[in-house]
């Protein structure tokens, strides 16, 4: 399988490269439009400042390239945020796949720290619980039925901005308020957390994406 990773001015990209190598996949790290279009799967990870990232992407017209991709695309961390309509981080318009805006966490109590950093539990949004369904990205991880103890899915987060729960949400987390831990629309899948740093749960999520 040919897996491409979008190369841009963001941190943490190489941790995703290493995660794929542990799965015996050698990804292509590229900002070339043709190579991204030809890939079987495209991953769009990263940590960084949304406005600076969008400036870089637009200067190379990568925002248009990403928007027009037809194969499964996986946005991770700031990659999820950049696929939204607008971000408060730098007050910038983003790629616009998801009709959602990115907000900054507003601490409500003294113990609320920003950035949110650490392990947190994934849950199904109420809409999917009502349907009794789970998105294929979370096959074997989440369930409409209550999960307890070791069957609960915990993943690793580091972020100061979040996407509110919306019609695209396929998994939620709760920090200060419930928010979109993961989203899906058409061929675009995202997560706010770092699957490459989330142990066996994260590895299974990446495998599920590659099998879409």
Task: Give a label for each model feature.
Residues 1-4:
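Extreme N-terminal starter segment of soluble prokaryotic enzymes
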Residues 11:
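Conserved Rossmann-like nucleotide-cofactor binding loop
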Residues 39:
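An anion/phosphate-binding loop that grips the pyrophosphate of nucleotide cofactors and donors
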Residues 43-45:
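Structural motif
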Residues 48-120, 126:
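Cysteine-nucleophile active-site neighborhood
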Residues 68, 101-212:
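Amide-donor transfer/coupling interface in amidating biosynthetic enzymes
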